[in-house]
UniProtKB/Swiss-Prot annotation:
One annotated Gene Ontology cellular component of this protein: cytoplasm
Matches recorded under InterPro entries: Endonuclease-V
Family indicated by similarity: Belongs to the endonuclease V family.
Thermal activity profile: Optimum temperature is 85 degrees Celsius.
Site (Interaction with target DNA): 74
UniProt-listed Pfam families: Endonuclease_5
Highest taxon of the lineage: Archaea
Protein name: Endonuclease V
The organism's taxonomic lineage, starting at the top: Archaea, Methanobacteriati, Methanobacteriota, Archaeoglobi, Archaeoglobales
EC number annotated for this UniProt entry: 3.1.21.7
UniProt organism field: Archaeoglobus fulgidus (strain ATCC 49558 / DSM 4304 / JCM 9628 / NBRC 100126 / VC-16)
Length: 221
């Protein structure tokens, strides 16, 4: 596997983060599609699944699956180097000028403001929203019942949202080319009663189906 000095990787992330734009490249009312991307690992391979949904109807119109060799080890906060290119390869054929991307991974709510969603945004020059089930970075400050701001100092870098009655919050942050408030609004508009927004939930379901097909003895449900 490719090995690099962690200080050099941090420098790359910090340099990329300086290119982040926290303004809407596409007004939400002009969005026509949302693409969700999710990934899973089988031994030394990564399965990347992307689904394209109409917006705001949230109907699946296309999907893509890529299986590639893993070329980088698992290191927390450096997942963009492990998962970034495979995710880009799965998504790039589904996005157009009226599409945003939802990523199972962090955006700027990351110690160096450069999570997986940020990497994908900057590579494809498309708006991305990062969605995670755990808080990686940022102080939570309650805004209202079930909603918290994620702060880095005094700056809002995302939100934590209790997306269904009995679930723990999800963590939402822009990757690039979308504001934190628009990332929250888009996420809310993609919810259909489940913890995860539909683009991520359906991509996750597809990923599990593909993984089962590739590993017949898997107990994955």
């Amino acid at each position: 596997m490719l090995q690099m000095n962690l200080e050099e990787l941090r420098r790359i992330q910090e340099e990329m983060s300086r290119s982040v734009v926290l303004e809407d490249l596409i007004p939400l009312e002009e969005l026509e599609y949302v693409v969700g991307v999710d990934q899973a690992f089988i031994s030394d391979e990564v399965v990347s699944c992307a689904v394209k949904l109409t917006f705001p109807e949230l109907e699946v119109v296309d999907k893509a699956v890529r299986v590639e060799k893993v070329t980088f080890p698992y290191i927390p906060t450096f997942l963009m180097f492990r998962e970034g290119e495979p995710a880009v390869n799965a998504v790039k054929g589904l996005v157009d000028d009226r599409a945003a991307i939802m990523v199972d991974g962090s955006g700027i709510a990351h110690p160096r403001r450069c999570g997986l969603a940020t990497y994908i945004a900057l590579k494809l020059r498309k708006p991305t929203v990062g969605i995670t089930k755990k808080r990686l970075f940022g102080e939570m400050v309650e805004v209202e019942d079930g909603l918290w701001r994620l702060l880095d100092g005094s700056e809002t870098i995302g939100y934590a949202l209790k997306s269904c009655r009995r679930c723990k919050p999800i963590f939402i942050s822009p990757g690039s080319y979308i504001s934190p408030d628009s990332a929250l609004e888009l996420t809310r508009k993609c919810l259909k009663g489940y913890k995860l927004p539909e683009p991520i939930r359906i991509a996750d379901k597809l990923t599990k189906e593909v993984k089962r097909e590739l590993t017949p003895t898997s107990k994955l449900k």
